[in-house]
Amino acid sequence: MGTTRHNNRAIVATKAGEMGRVVALMDDLFFQMKLAETAKQLGVEVKVATNGEAFLGLMASEPKLVIVDLNARSQPIAAIEKLRETRKDVRVVAFLSHVQTELAAQAKAAGCNEVLPRSSFTQNLAAILSAAKD
């Protein structure tokens, strides 16, 4: 059975059995809950950090996928750059408003594999998370 634990640094959704591991950097509560619920349904373990320091700390869990909200208030581009200094192999998917083309270019330059408009990210969230199970 699934459980969700909350504290001031991370939200962790877990489910018994074999799981993919996902780490996310986002401070938007709506997206945190959507991510946790979708992950729970798919049997994917998700750890969500609300700041760059907690995000980098969660990387010790060896995630298969990293998700970044480029509109997070905690310098997400810097967090991606820092991540890429040590982890070049992990897939990084970021999302933002479709009009933020300059921010999208910065994210790609920082090391994002994919940068999606928020609407596309939401629409394809189940498929994005399912890829972490492979």
Q: What are these regions, as identified by a protein language model?
A:
Residues G111-Q123:
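Output/docking surface of receiver
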Residues G43-T50:
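Short hydrophobic/Thr-rich beta-strand motif most characteristic of the beta2 strand and flanking loop
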Residues R84-D89:
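Conserved phosphotransfer cores of two-component systems
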Residues V99-E114:
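Alpha4 helix (beta4-alpha4-beta5 surface) of REC/receiver domains from two-component response regulators
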Residues G20-D28:
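Conserved acidic segment of CheY-like receiver
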Residues V68-L83:
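Conserved phosphotransfer microenvironments
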Residues T50-L65:
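Acidic, metal-coordinating helix/loop segments flanking the phosphotransfer/catalytic sites
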